From Swiss-Prot:
Alphabetical UniProt keywords: Amino-acid biosynthesis, Cysteine biosynthesis, Plasmid, Pyridoxal phosphate, Transferase
Function: As it is highly similar to bacterial and plant cysteine synthases, it is possible that it catalyzes a related reaction.
Reactions catalysed according to its record: O-acetyl-L-serine + hydrogen sulfide = L-cysteine + acetate
Protein name: Putative cysteine synthase
Sites of N6-(pyridoxal phosphate)lysine modification: 41
InterPro entries: Cys_Synth/Cystath_Beta-Synth, P-phosphate_BS, TrpB-like_PALP, TrpB-like_PALP_sf
The enzyme's E.C. designation: 2.5.1.47
Keyword Ubl conjugation annotated: no
Length: 336
């Protein structure tokens, strides 16, 4: 098929299996980093823009404003190009530099929030405030507000339909990251509609407040809800069977491990989801076909989580994680 716009390339991403010997389980990765903007957020960005244009909230030639750590912003930049819109991304120091460079390359205007923030502090509240202000003040502008936008979870309908077609023997469990809650809600609701017995496990960073734990700073980007922010209205707790936390070290060391053992560069949040999926499989809590998404690629984090000096300076290295992963995947520890 010959495509004529870049957003037509969104979806139909491949799947890759990782066998877990002796556990009656296979971990399946949905390679969402293969979307044109490099992440699964392309799906919901397109969904939100189309919905806003159709219901008149966003006029032709208008301006999209959104608070983003980068992936949603990249997806919105692509959609803005296709539909002839202006896009302003409101970011903070926590966003990966390469994500900001990518948004700029696609024509997005970047606005930084001002403030004295710790390096591991996510300034979501300040980003949301500035984005809402710009959306209200600029003529023809709309603050997309992905955390409360129903078109966010609706954007993942196609992902589940693809999985059902790709895995005809069925899906037994889904392990996904939770940030705004859009992908976790959209995927989990549709999976359970197809099969109510599917187990759904939501993973947030240690320090995130989605499941009521005390909040503190964390380095994982584009996932979780930091202290001081409110959990998004799109998150449907009713479709989630269990919420768990993963540390920065567990998430980042797993991403590095997958790169070196499987040749697949995944982002830090994906590393966290893979770690928890394997932990649950190793403990016998999940069996059968267990799916998670490669939400974005590690190519955006080569200067951070894949950089030895960056990791060491922040005391995030722990070779015991690789040994633990070897134990789950090979039944024994190997040299990291």
């Amino acid at each position: 098929m010959l495509h004529t716009t870049v957003t037509q390339l969104i979806g139909q991403t491949p799947v890759m299996s990782i066998d877990v010997p002796g556990r009656n389980a296979t971990l399946v990765l949905k390679i969402e980093k293969n979307n044109p903007g490099g992440s699964m957020k392309d799906r919901m960005a397109r969904s939100m823009v189309i919905a806003a244009l159709q219901d008149g909230r966003l006029p032709p030639g208008g301006t999209i404003v959104e608070s983003s750590s980068g992936n949603t912003g990249t997806g919105l930049a692509l959609a803005a190009l296709e539909f002839g819109l202006r896009f302003i991304a409101v970011v903070d120091h926590h966003a990966a530099p390469d994500k900001i460079r990518m948004m700029r390359a696609l024509g997005a205007e970047i606005r930084y929030v001002e403030g004295d923030f710790r390096e591991d502090e996510v300034a979501v509240v300040e980003r949301q405030r500035l984005a809402a202000q710009l959306g209200a003040q600029l003529p023809g502008a709309l603050f997309m507000n992905q955390s409360d936008n129903p078109a966010n979870p609706e954007g993942y309908t196609g992902l589940v339909d693809e999985l059902v077609a790709q895995l005809p023997d069925g899906i037994d469990a889904f392990v996904g990251c939770v940030g705004t809650g859009g992908s976790m809600t959209g995927i989990s609701q549709r999976l359970k509609r197809n099969n109510p017995a599917v187990r759904t496990i939501a993973v947030e960073p240690a320090g995130s407040i989605v499941f009521g734990k005390p909040g503190h700073p964390y380095y994982q980007s584009g996932t979780g809800t930091p202290a001081g922010d409110e959990v998004g209205k799109v998150l449907d707790y009713g479709c989630i069977d269990e919420g768990v936390q993963v540390t920065d070290t567990q998430a980042f060391e797993t991403a590095r491990y997958i790169a070196r053992r499987k040749g697949l560069l995944v982002g830090g949040s994906t590393g966290g989801a893979i770690y928890k999926a394997l932990e649950f499989i190793g403990a016998g809590k999940l069996t059968g076909t267990v799916v998670t998404t490669v939400a974005d690629g590690g190519e955006k984090y080569l200067g951070t989580i894949f950089d030895e000096e960056w990791m060491a300076k922040r005391r995030l290295l722990d070779p015991a994680i690789a040994a633990q992963l070897d134990g789950w995947l090979f039944g024994k520890a190997r040299a990291a």
